[in-house]
Amino acid sequence: MADHMMAMNHSRFQDGTNGLHHPAHRMGMGQFPSPHHHQHTFNSLMGEHMHYVPGNMNSNNSIRHAMVTGNVNGGHPNGSIAPAARFNNSQFMGPPVTNQGAQLTASMQLQKLNNQYFTHQPYPHNHYIPDLHPTNHPLNGTNQHFKECNPKHSTGLPPSVSHVPAAILPPGVIDTDFIDEEVLMSLVIEMGLDRIKELPELWLGQNEFDFMTDFVCKQPNRVSC
C-alpha cells in the first residue's frame, strides 16, 4: 500500500520532493532540466539578490524581489551580464548618495541669501500693527491690510505713533504708553516721595562721604603714646 501511494505521488509530482513543488516552479521561474539544476540556479539568484537588496528590506521582500525580477530567457538565467549591471536599474535600490561638497555649497548659498534678506529689511523684527480702522480699508476675503508704525517707511501715510491714543495701541508697545499725571501724583503721595526734602535718610547715599569727613574733622584729636 505504501509503495502504491509513493508511486502515485511520484507520478503526480515528477519534479518535486515529498509531493511538494519546488518554490522556483511555483513562482514561475521556468522549466529546468533537473531538480538539481534549478536548485543550484535558485540558490545563486537568491545569493545575488540578498547581496544587492538595501538594508531596510525584510527577508520576504528580498525573496519576492529575487523571484519576480530575475532575468530569465527561455528558462535559463542570463549569466552573461554582471550582477552589478543586472541590478543597477532595480526599483528597490535606494537613491544615490549625493556629494557632501554640493550640500555644503547649497547650505552656504542659502545662508548668504538669508543674510541679504535680513540686511535689506530696515527693521528685522516685527514692526507691523493691524489696521486700526477697518471701515476705511475694507477687507478683501483673506487679504488683510497692515500699516507700519514708522510713517517714513509706510505707503498709506498712517498717523504718527505720538498722535495715536494709548488705548488703541497694542499691549507690547511700552515706549509709547501714556501715563496720566493724576495717577503719577497719587503714586508719589502714596510712596511719600513728595516729602523727600523732609527725609534726610533718603539722601544719605549722596552725602555719605561729606558726612564722614565732617564727622572726623569735628572729633577731638587723640594722641596715643
Curated annotation (Swiss-Prot):
GO molecular-function term, one example from the UniProt record: transcription coactivator activity
Q: Supply the InterPro entries for this chain.
A: CITED
Q: Which residues form a coiled coil?
A: none
Localization terms from the record: Nucleus
GO cellular component terms, semicolon-separated: nucleus
Q: Please name the Pfam families in this protein's record.
A: CITED (PF04487)
Domain of life, per UniProt, equals: Eukaryota
Key word Transcription regulation present: yes
Q: Which GO terms describe its biological process?
A: cell differentiation; left/right pattern formation; sex determination
Q: Which family does it belong to?
A: Belongs to the CITED family.
Q: What does this protein do?
A: Transcriptional coactivator or corepressor of the p300/CBP-mediated transcription complex. May be involved in sex determination, early gonad development, left-right patterning during embryogenesis and differentiation of the adrenal cortex.
Name this polypeptide is given: Cbp/p300-interacting transactivator 2
**Organism source for this protein?**
Xenopus laevis
Gene that specifies this protein: cited2
